[in-house]
Amino acid sequence: MHPVKRIEIISDSVELGKIVEALEKIGVTSYSIIHNVSSKGIKGTVFDDSAVTMLDNVYVIAFCSPDKAKPVVEEIRPILNKFGGSCWISEVMEIRSVRCIASM
């Protein structure tokens, strides 16, 4: 096991391209994206009641080495400040498995 940073971002789908571009610019190339996210926060509740996918919320989860967390914040913060959204970064432990289950 080794320490990594877990990055979670919720934003409008419209900003997804900018967020992904920022992550990849820093070298965070492994991430998952979940579309049509409903949530509730200090600004109220956001439901997935739109037929237009450009107005949906997305959830991006990525993991990176601890040294990349600060550059991620510097790139993501202006996007979220301008267009809205939330970002959380936490410390987690990664377990790397190099053993193929099929060979067991």
Predicted regions and their residues:
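Positively charged, small/polar-rich N-terminal and surface patches that mediate targeting and assembly
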Residues: 1-104
